[in-house]
């Protein structure tokens, strides 16, 4: 499954500080020469890849970024302070284009990979630089140069091998948070997740598996209800589906069938995709009144899929479930685009 997130922003490097006109005025140097210092260089703008970021969502609310200006020069040949560079963090996998020309400026694929995107302006020259035999007391200096301004288009492409599906509040965001370093928004109301959350889960071998928490589906999603087609499309290219079911529900079988019917109605082979079921939230279940093992057996008979009894909160049962997922993935051919992201 490939996610393409886009954002358009403007970045501006800092203007260089102005050079100044100044002359030496020491007590015993009555005819002191020029001593105006140069302006400081403006700050530059850099992009840095951060493995803890998952989307370009922040750029939808903040479209303009500007580095600090350099300060003006000082007397006694003092150069002004340089402007602070601006570091903009983006997720690994972000591609940066010039929005006006379409030129590819950079592709940040590795953690901490850095790209200079806009150069700060040079500081202006102070009048000390214009001293000559003809002009012993120059009374002019140069202003600092402007920093580069660029209109940019950012694109983020990520591929997920495992799609976590289920009704709203089944615990998908909590699970992906427990399994990986992702920290999705988590709250106890439907549709908390409005965009897919991505997390990389490491195998004991060190290889990473990309999991996607697909926003909650509801009855009628295949016809556009709720968050509808947008999120069913997100799971078309997943290789394995992890179907999370709330064990505290008053009708676990109904909940399972709701998602199953939506996958079948949508088509695209989703219902035939390799699937694992997980009864979640067992930490909140009264084991004296709810027979989890019987529910798991019933779900297994309905789905012909392995069923695990887990708690995303306490991490109970997660390891056997992961081993099953990795076993299925190991038996399948790895797409080239997924391999490239490992």
UniProtKB/Swiss-Prot annotation:
<feature type="binding site">
    <location>
        <begin position="213"/>
        <end position="216"/>
    </location>
    <ligand>
        <name>GTP</name>
    </ligand>
</feature>
<protein>
    <recommendedName>
        <fullName>GTPase Obg</fullName>
        <ecNumber>3.6.5.-</ecNumber>
    </recommendedName>
</protein>
<feature type="binding site">
    <location>
        <begin position="280"/>
        <end position="283"/>
    </location>
    <ligand>
        <name>GTP</name>
    </ligand>
</feature>
<keyword id="KW-0479">Metal-binding</keyword>
<dbReference type="Pfam" id="PF01926">
    <property type="entry name" value="MMR_HSR1"/>
</dbReference>
<feature type="domain" description="Obg">
    <location>
        <begin position="1"/>
        <end position="159"/>
    </location>
</feature>
<dbReference type="InterPro" id="IPR006073">
    <property type="entry name" value="GTP-bd"/>
</dbReference>
<feature type="binding site">
    <location>
        <begin position="191"/>
        <end position="195"/>
    </location>
    <ligand>
        <name>GTP</name>
    </ligand>
</feature>
<feature type="domain" description="OBG-type G">
    <location>
        <begin position="160"/>
        <end position="330"/>
    </location>
</feature>
<dbReference type="GO" id="GO:0005525">
    <property type="term" value="F:GTP binding"/>
</dbReference>
<dbReference type="InterPro" id="IPR045086">
    <property type="entry name" value="OBG_GTPase"/>
</dbReference>
<keyword id="KW-0378">Hydrolase</keyword>
<dbReference type="GO" id="GO:0003924">
    <property type="term" value="F:GTPase activity"/>
</dbReference>
<dbReference type="GO" id="GO:0042254">
    <property type="term" value="P:ribosome biogenesis"/>
</dbReference>
<comment type="similarity">
    <text>Belongs to the TRAFAC class OBG-HflX-like GTPase superfamily. OBG GTPase family.</text>
</comment>
<dbReference type="GO" id="GO:0005737">
    <property type="term" value="C:cytoplasm"/>
</dbReference>
<dbReference type="InterPro" id="IPR014100">
    <property type="entry name" value="GTP-bd_Obg/CgtA"/>
</dbReference>
<dbReference type="InterPro" id="IPR031167">
    <property type="entry name" value="G_OBG"/>
</dbReference>
<keyword id="KW-0460">Magnesium</keyword>
<dbReference type="InterPro" id="IPR036726">
    <property type="entry name" value="GTP1_OBG_dom_sf"/>
</dbReference>
<feature type="binding site">
    <location>
        <position position="193"/>
    </location>
    <ligand>
        <name>Mg(2+)</name>
    </ligand>
</feature>
<comment type="function">
    <text>An essential GTPase which binds GTP, GDP and possibly (p)ppGpp with moderate affinity, with high nucleotide exchange rates and a fairly low GTP hydrolysis rate. Plays a role in control of the cell cycle, stress response, ribosome biogenesis and in those bacteria that undergo differentiation, in morphogenesis control.</text>
</comment>
<keyword id="KW-0342">GTP-binding</keyword>
<dbReference type="GO" id="GO:0000287">
    <property type="term" value="F:magnesium ion binding"/>
</dbReference>
<dbReference type="InterPro" id="IPR006169">
    <property type="entry name" value="GTP1_OBG_dom"/>
</dbReference>
<feature type="binding site">
    <location>
        <begin position="166"/>
        <end position="173"/>
    </location>
    <ligand>
        <name>GTP</name>
    </ligand>
</feature>
<feature type="binding site">
    <location>
        <position position="173"/>
    </location>
    <ligand>
        <name>Mg(2+)</name>
    </ligand>
</feature>
<dbReference type="InterPro" id="IPR005225">
    <property type="entry name" value="Small_GTP-bd"/>
</dbReference>
<keyword id="KW-0963">Cytoplasm</keyword>
<keyword id="KW-0547">Nucleotide-binding</keyword>
<dbReference type="InterPro" id="IPR027417">
    <property type="entry name" value="P-loop_NTPase"/>
</dbReference>
<comment type="subunit">
    <text>Monomer.</text>
</comment>
<dbReference type="Pfam" id="PF01018">
    <property type="entry name" value="GTP1_OBG"/>
</dbReference>
<feature type="binding site">
    <location>
        <begin position="311"/>
        <end position="313"/>
    </location>
    <ligand>
        <name>GTP</name>
    </ligand>
</feature>
